[in-house]
């Protein structure tokens, strides 16, 4: 049996579904299924057969009787039906910046600048949507935003400021998604756009490291000093072991004892694996509910989860309002779980406020798994390392 982790809306209030799943082999057989006084007749065919029963919302755990009769035999048991957990799923849309994956940085920069323009237009286009379905977008890296502030007209900058202030667009603080090649000085210098953002009156308090399964420990020090409160790690398990068996929120402690709140998220396009950008509602529905079942089985401690996604299922993808339509359709059907569009920092703030006593502290480095890839550009890696060394030497000489 499966108690579906959802409450759906009907004219008679919220209802929940219990599925009786019967695996059958052999010839077609007539069966009678009786669950909690409700009776259904079903033809059992080869494979999995599902009988669905509707219940009023259960407020307390209950044992409900079940019997299945076929071929002259009756099997009886009981089903534990618990109240449906009141989940909230935050859909966090971003564009994943992957230099070289589709084209070089000089070619993709113009696209990423246009994506910010698109995001502003999509905010305008969904202003009249229900709040949970309004377009929201997180600028994953600071590089494109920094360049945007240098080249766009004042009216566009004003539009961006307005949407950032409203919480419809969020600026993240990492210049790019860094591997382990840059040294500490380079990583410190990479946070320079924070000064630019703050001089422009733009809030930026979350770092996003996507598609890299580690991050320099020095960042936990730098972020704390720079007023960056949150670190969102959008993982990618290809040829890698991802830390923890489920999404995990923890205080990441620096070598000196400073802390930032970190979230080991799922894959940085987890929502695309669900089909958030498609028009296939049934597929999306099935995968979301299956995922919440998995989180329940893994004892996930919070009632809120976040799923990152892009407008289309690829890196360097433009934003899209398709997810807004999917979220709107979901909430028209379901009372729980609730799904909403969100920016990255919203999950952190919710967890920090409601579950402070459940957040562990971890002190340690977070190394990446994909350092074997450096050999693919051995000449460039060597030039980079020599340049880093020379910069350190030159700075030392200049300081004298």
Report residues per predicted region.
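Catalytic-domain carbohydrate-binding cleft regions of carbohydrate-active enzymes
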Residues: 1-400
